Amino acid sequence: RGENEPAVYYHAEGDLLVLTLVDDLLIDGVESDIKWLLAELEERFDCKDPETVEEDSPLDYLGMEITRIGNTIYLSMEKYIENECNILDVQGRTPKVPISEPIDTTSTPLTPQQKKKFLAAVGMLGWLSGTVRCDISYAFSRIAQLSAMPTQSALDSVLRVFAYLRGCKELCISINQDAPDRNIQDIMTSQDTPNEWRFYSDSDHAGNREVQNKRRSQN
């Protein structure tokens, strides 16, 4: 198991990388090593036929669409976002720009049915922020803090996030396979990465007027 990612495993003597999520696997490596691993798994478990990421043929992995074009792999949640927006009925909603309204924890408490909708939406946001859409991580963390006693203001906020996502649902993460070769074992035990990442944030902690924000060292 990798030292820097507990859900990712590697074979110390082969070119093989396995990402796990409960009983779903993503496998990358040399074709012969992949076939060996699949044969080992099929001896112990009842496995579905494996799917392969082919050129211009997207593969769905738990709502995340994996597409390969040339030597670049794209990770997208576009279809997942569209589906969840339909479920939450936010097709006609547009986010305010800029969003200047703090979450009012003293507004009207949600009914049991509304709370069910709120918690489902928060769960969807959690999956999105933890996979491809890291741009909503701060918004998700703030909204999720209100899961115990959500209000109408909190529900409006989570729906605004989905309205934002619907407006830029095509954003994705790209991975270029032309990056310099590194031994898998070195990658999985390293505390740094040769990849260049850029992150941007417009979170305004100083301008947050919520009372509970003043009691936290970070959000």
Residue spans for each PLM region:
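Divalent metal-binding acidic/histidine catalytic loops
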Residues: 16, 80-219
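Short hydrophobic beta-strand that contains or immediately precedes a catalytic carboxylate
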Residues: 21-22, 61, 198-201
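Short amphipathic alpha-helical segments embedded in low-complexity Lys/Glu-rich regions
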Residues: 6-10, 55-58, 143-145, 178-182
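Non-catalytic, low-complexity flexible loops and terminal extensions
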Residues: 49-85, 89-104
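Eukaryote-biased feature marking scaffold/signaling PDZ-domain proteins and nuclear chromatin regulators
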Residues: 3, 13, 20-22, 54, ...
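Catalytic palm subdomain of template-directed nucleic-acid polymerases
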Residues: 11-46, 65-76, 145-152
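Conserved beta-strand/loop block within the catalytic cores
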Residues: 1-21, 183-189
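A short, aromatic/hydrophobic, helix- or strand-capping loop or linear motif
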Residues: 4, 50-53, 171
